[in-house]
Amino acid sequence: MTKPIPKIGSRRNSRISSRKSGCRTPIGVIHVQASFNNTIVTVTDPQGRVVSWSSAGTCGFKGTRRGTPFAAQTAAGNAIRAVVDQGMQRAEVMIKGPGLGRDAALRAIRRSGILLNFVRDVTPMPHNGCRPPKKRRV
């Protein structure tokens, strides 16, 4: 009979530390994706690792209310509250999409007390890409 090989550093022996507690990033990037149906706010560190995120759906808004400016404002406030507690002071803002929550999310970010380096619109624009559908004849 062979003896089982002892596991070195198994989960029971080692202490698992969460990444959220160790994050002390003074600078971050706030990504706002505003579609017509929802607004998603993601806060990352400069390397692109997600520190915090929130959306209008996770804030409790259902159906068509997720696309409203108030829902976007609430989502931005929830996402930023967590990183302000961790010590974030400066941020860059990237806004993507045509939704109603663009301006409301930006106002909530400005009100949170984080200093903004710049605000950039990164909405993808086609350079005459796909052919549009044919015109409707009614």
From Swiss-Prot:
Q: Which branch of life, at top level? A: Eukaryota
Q: Which GO terms describe its biological process?
A: translation
Q: Cite the entry's keywords alphabetically.
A: Chloroplast, Plastid, Ribonucleoprotein, Ribosomal protein, RNA-binding, rRNA-binding
Q: Does Ribosomal protein show up as a keyword for this record?
A: yes
Q: Which GO terms describe its cellular component?
A: chloroplast; ribonucleoprotein complex; ribosome
Give its localization. Answer: Plastid, Chloroplast
Q: Where is this region: Disordered?
A: 1-22
Instruction: Work out whether the entry's keyword set contains RNA-binding.
Output: yes
Query: What InterPro entries does its record include?
Result: Ribosomal_uS11, Ribosomal_uS11_bac-type, Ribosomal_uS11_CS, Ribosomal_uS11_sf
Q: Where is the composition biased (Basic residues)?
A: 9-22
A molecular function (GO) held by this record is: structural constituent of ribosome
- From the UniProt record, list the coiled-coil ranges: none
The record's listing under HAMAP family reads:
Ribosomal_uS11
As for family, the record states: Belongs to the universal ribosomal protein uS11 family.
Assembly and partners? Part of the 30S ribosomal subunit.
What is the name of the protein in this document?
A: Small ribosomal subunit protein uS11c
The species is Nymphaea alba
The major lineage groups are: Eukaryota, Viridiplantae, Streptophyta, Embryophyta, Tracheophyta
